[in-house]
From Swiss-Prot:
Organism in which the protein naturally occurs: Homo sapiens
Signal peptide: 1-26
Primary location class: secreted
Protein name (database record): Neuroendocrine protein 7B2
GO MF annotation list: enzyme inhibitor activity; enzyme regulator activity; GTP binding; unfolded protein binding
């Protein structure tokens, strides 16, 4: 009698396992849910459509690819807000902020790029936001921007938060001008005849010529 009951229970358990059923006492937290990932994606897509942040996906089969004429463009980028990501639009999109060393960067006060001088045109003064009595030449512009890399407003002028063109111009006028080099030091000394440029015309001496 007991053996018959044991065999009946074992056969029932084997039938459950063969059918893919799991008894309640054998439930493990590692067992995946019966809801498929596709069902979850469809649910999330429906919620995002209700919120207005998901657009229906339009796909073109391979045989219709040649029917697309005219310029094609792709929208979306680093700073374009929420985007339609993933086949169901369910991939979370976070608008990233450009930072340096985890510190938000204020691009209005950026000192990373040189600021060219702004000489005053005829009839304008310094009150109009330009520099008076400055030479409007390319050489002065190069010198002006070169000094910006050496100019430290935080230490030289503690009250300033960004470049001050007027103070920089005053500093340039008071300092010693850099001497221009008119002689290239790399062209001095004895020339190496065995070193030739790649595009130079090959030179053959008379000794290398074949006797006629």
């Amino acid at each position: 009698m007991v053996s018959r009951m044991v065999s009946t229970m074992l056969s029932g358990l084997l039938f459950w396992l063969a059918s893919g059923w799991t008894p309640a006492f054998a439930y493990s937290p590692r067992t995946p849910d019966r809801v498929s990932e596709a069902d979850i994606q469809r649910l999330l897509h429906g919620v995002m459509e209700q919120l207005g942040i998901a657009r229906p996906r339009v796909e073109y089969p391979a045989h219709q690819a040649m029917n697309l004429v005219g310029p094609q463009s792709i929208e979306g980028g680093a700073h374009e807000g929420l985007q339609h990501l993933g086949p169901f639009g369910n991939i979370p999109n976070i608008v990233a902020e450009l930072t340096g060393d985890n510190i938000p960067k204020d691009f209005s006060e950026d000192q990373g790029y040189p600021d060219p001088p702004n000489p005053c045109p005829v009839g304008k003064t310094a009150d109009d936001g330009c520099l008076e009595n400055t030479p409007d030449t390319a050489e002065f512009s190069r010198e002006f921007q070169l000094h910006q890399h050496l100019f430290d407003p935080e230490h030289d002028y503690p009250g300033l938060g960004k470049w001050n063109k007027k103070l920089l111009y005053e500093k340039m006028k008071g300092g010693e001008r850099r001497k221009r080099r008119s002689v290239n030091p790399y062209l001095q000394g004895q020339r190496l005849d065995n070193v030739v440029a790649k595009k130079s015309v090959p030179h053959f001496s008379d000794e290398d010529k074949d006797p006629e």
